[in-house]
């Protein structure tokens, strides 16, 4: 009996000792400290499980603050990127989305929709960058994010000219890298 009690006390001491040790969490880099994504590190997960689904009919703000819906973009394929100013991978992939928007302007519309809660915050962040092609849309209620049902930023969805989903990438991506080029060539080539 004494041996059992000593064994039990020893086990408790080990367990309690383990609970007392707290590891210091590794700090996440600030969004402004993240560099342009490297292909292997920022290879978001390709998801085709929503292929053929219609664009969500939610309303958010265009770059001028007017009400806007994705349905206004039908007629040409559109790549919709959900992002936020505080999201490191989002910020890292933004320059590559800007490059893509310029290179594919004739075949593809690219819009970036911030999930931040303030137009002033997004506009202030945007003013410090020199994007040539992209303009910041805003979904402060996160309605588009909820419609996409990923819970992850960045999330990027490609819709065909009829407004049907082709695929989505959940997580960061180098949008002017070889993987993105292959995905887009297959999708856009099939629509010509």
Residue ranges and their predicted role:
Residues 17, 63, 161:
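Short, ordered coil/turn segments that flank beta-strands lining enzyme active or ligand-binding pockets
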Residues 125-133, 138-189:
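Thiol/disulfide oxidoreductase modules built on the thioredoxin-like
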Residues 1-57, 192:
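N-terminal targeting signals for export/organelle localization
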Residues 47-52, 57-78:
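A short beta-strand-turn-helix
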Residues 91-129, 140-146:
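Structural microenvironment flanking redox-active thiols in thiol-disulfide oxidoreductases
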Residues 81, 111-113, 135-137:
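Structural recognition of the beta-strand scaffold that forms the well-ordered cores
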Residues 76-78, 82-86, 152, 162:
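Short pre-active-site segment immediately N-terminal to redox-active cysteine/selenocysteine motifs
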Residues 74, 82-99:
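Conserved redox-active cysteine motifs that mediate thiol-disulfide chemistry
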